[in-house]
Amino acid sequence: MSLNPRDVVIVDFGRTPMGRSKGGMHRNTRAEDMSAHLISKLLERNAKVDPAEVEDVIWGCVNQTLEQGWNIARMASLMTQIPHTSAGQTVSRLCGSSMSALHTAAQAIMTGNGDVFVVGGVEHMGHVSMMHGVDPNPHMSLYAAKASGMMGLTAEMLGKMHGITREQQDAFGVRSHQLAHKATVEGKFKDEIIPMQGYDENGFLKLFDYDETIRPETTLESLAALKPAFNPKGGTVTAGTSSQITDGASCMIVMSAQRAQDLGIQPMAVIRSMAVAGVDPAIMGYGPVPATQKALKRAGLGINDIDFFELNEAFAAQALPVLKDLKVLDKMNEKVNLHGGAIALGHPFGCSGARISGTLLNVMKQNGGTFGVSTMCIGLGQGISTVFERV
């Protein structure tokens, strides 16, 4: 494959183990420390990359307050081997924040505004709760349905519109845990998880190199016993078919193809296209459909050209309609989220975009895929997608 000098390549990817937000492994670790540890370790294992060459650290984070406030990208960067002469910015596109961080770096590289970037994101939902400090404008109800701000109800709406049953959602939830457990047992996450010290349930310090969020004992029967989480009367979305509230961070080293060649680095993949799109906030979970269609058009590809997909599992009731309208539902078991997704691993907001993209690249490497798409829905009605080609 021939690459153009300003093509954007992914050099490496790493993430923390995913921790439960309630009493989980990261309960005594701050978001900046988690981020700095990840950046440092990823740079250590890529010795050909000079930290002084990093143009910018672009970090996704949604709730930018408390320990995640005051530009956590810069806070974390200053705690690493990256010199203070490099810059740092924190970005938020809610659930799509760290994928937007990747897009921002890619756009800079494409336009000659830097060659080497560190991108990723973090969310410590145990320390900074989802609604901490949030004050929604009551006037918004003049422009969007009140329930649009309640993600679970938007998932209920989307599932109802597309005829998604409770049984289908439960099966999807079981699949996520089973595949994530299988990937763990088979060592499929070995290259992406950067081990971190944390505390076990007894309060003992230990080195975690696995996700504590996966529940391999999950069954259809256990999920069927759960009550609806958002709509008590007739709802179908439960805690077992929703993304978990977790703590975690993810990181990528991104550079121009020319700089990678100069350094003698073999990249993981090249970005072929990117896109964002908006939808009615009432069906926010549908955003990946127009975003992916737009990205595929920009890449000159069709849906059948894509070997593997990573779709953020915000809710089973949201993921299934997306797969249905992208015409890949019948190929789900061969192409989609082969290592499970956010139902099993969790959805630390600022972390997830880079997390699913990096997991996708490892799935492509392990299974010999050429093209892959990572995509996710975004609160208040957006979607974001990236098309990768394996190098």
From Swiss-Prot:
A biological-process GO annotation: phenylacetate catabolic process
GO MF annotation list: acetyl-CoA C-acyltransferase activity
Superkingdom of source: Bacteria
Pathway: Lipid metabolism; fatty acid beta-oxidation
InterPro entries, A to Z: FadA, Thiolase, Thiolase-like, Thiolase-like_sf_Thiolase, Thiolase_acyl_enz_int_AS, Thiolase_AS, Thiolase_C, Thiolase_CS
Keywords in alphabetical order: Acyltransferase, Cytoplasm, Fatty acid metabolism, Lipid degradation, Lipid metabolism, Transferase
Name this protein carries in UniProt: 3-ketoacyl-CoA thiolase
